[in-house]
UniProtKB/Swiss-Prot annotation:
Highest classification ranks of the organism: Eukaryota, Metazoa, Ecdysozoa, Arthropoda, Chelicerata
Protein name, entry field: Chymotrypsin inhibitor
Presence of keyword Membrane: no
Domain of life: Eukaryota
Stored InterPro entries: Ser_inhib-like_sf, TIL_dom
Record key words, sorted: Disulfide bond, Protease inhibitor, Secreted, Serine protease inhibitor, Signal
Amino acid sequence: MKTLCIFLVLVVAVAAFPPFISQHDCPPNKEFGSYGDCPPSCLKNPPNFCTLKLNYGCKCKEGYVLTRYQDYESDCIKPEECPDDS
């Protein structure tokens, strides 16, 4: 029983902390940091409501936007490079 309790505490501790990614692990035009639930993207009409949820990971650098709305794995490009049909 003691072993099970220790195991559960370790699982909760690991799950409670965001993954530690260094800046060099982020793709081009991205950097590690915190970002909100509605980061800038190529979407022309983003929603008016966003939660205050804070995410940690690779985010677009200043001056770049996600190619796909709320797809945090998508590439970051300059806004003027967004396709016209976004």
